[in-house]
């Protein structure tokens, strides 16, 4: 069974293509890394898959549901951590999670219980009563992940979850995500520029370039005998040569 399937998914902005004829196949239980250069169409794709942006053409099924027919049902069953963190700065971490759970229909006692468990799992229990505005960027990323998990989604969308956070925070988030997939708790669809981290996490990879899917499949098949970075560079055709000139850099005295 596929957690995500698209056929001919296309999005134009003012007549210009952002995503073209996308045919994604994300197996249930997979940790799927969706990669591409800046401006390749990753965020546009994620917005379409989460019901935040209507496609110009094509179809998408998420958890077996046709997005065009029942986007609200999909939104109830997925969790999303967007690139921009939309948190209430004047709430405490515990309040943020509890209220988020209640917005998904959880009773207050259950939302409170889940919030406490998530804070512990995310190593934020000691900061549960601090205002979100006093959290570091890495702590806010963890809290946003907790908000995406509190209602028990079957599919988790993560847009650049490791961007701008330190190695300790990355390690904690990575361990939690790996455990969720290993336990069969959910499917994860992730975009990231940090290929080294992605390579240690994902089971499947899709690479998008200039709005088109150029590579897709299990990680081992995509990277073949090389690294994911090497496969990525081959797929997007943007291997860089050493810059020419600049011989004046490093001179001790002006001439």
Where are these regions (language model features)?
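Catalytic Walker B motif of ABC-type/P-loop ATPase nucleotide-binding domains
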Residues: 156-160
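ABC ATPase "signature
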Residues: 216-217
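Conserved catalytic motifs of ABC-family nucleotide-binding domains
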Residues: 152
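Helical segment within the ABC ATPase nucleotide-binding domain
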Residues: 171-183
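Conserved ABC ATPase "signature" region
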Residues: 98, 102, 109-127
């Amino acid at each position: 069974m596929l957690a995500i399937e698209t056929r001919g998914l296309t999005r134009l902005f003012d007549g210009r293509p952002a995503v073209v004829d996308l045919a994604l196949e994300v197996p249930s239980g997979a940790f799927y890394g969706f990669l591409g250069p800046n401006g390749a169409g990753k965020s546009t794709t994620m917005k379409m898959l989460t019901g935040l942006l209507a496609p110009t053409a094509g179809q998408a099924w998420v958890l077996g549901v046709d997005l065009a027919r029942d986007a609200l049902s999909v939104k109830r069953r997925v969790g999303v951590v967007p690139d921009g963190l939309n948190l209430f700065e004047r709430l405490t971490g515990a309040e943020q999670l509890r209220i988020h759970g209640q917005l998904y229909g959880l009773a207050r006692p259950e939302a409170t219980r889940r919030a406490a468990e998530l804070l512990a799992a995310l190593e934020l229990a000691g900061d549960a009563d601090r205002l979100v505005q006093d959290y570091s960027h890495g702590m806010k990323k963890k809290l946003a992940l907790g908000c995406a998990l509190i209602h028990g989604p079957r599919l988790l969308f993560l847009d650049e979850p490791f961007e701008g956070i330190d190695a300790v925070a990355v390690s904690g988030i990575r361990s939690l995500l790996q455990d969720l997939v290993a336990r069969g708790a959910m499917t994860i669809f992730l975009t990231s520029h940090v290929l080294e981290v992605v390579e240690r996490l994902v089971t499947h990879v899709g690479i998008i370039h200039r709005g088109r899917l150029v590579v897709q499949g299990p990680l081992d098949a995509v990277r073949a005998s090389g690294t994911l970075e090497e496969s990525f560079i081959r797929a997007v055709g943007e291997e860089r040569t050493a810059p020419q000139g600049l011989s004046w850099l490093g001179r001790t005295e002006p001439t």
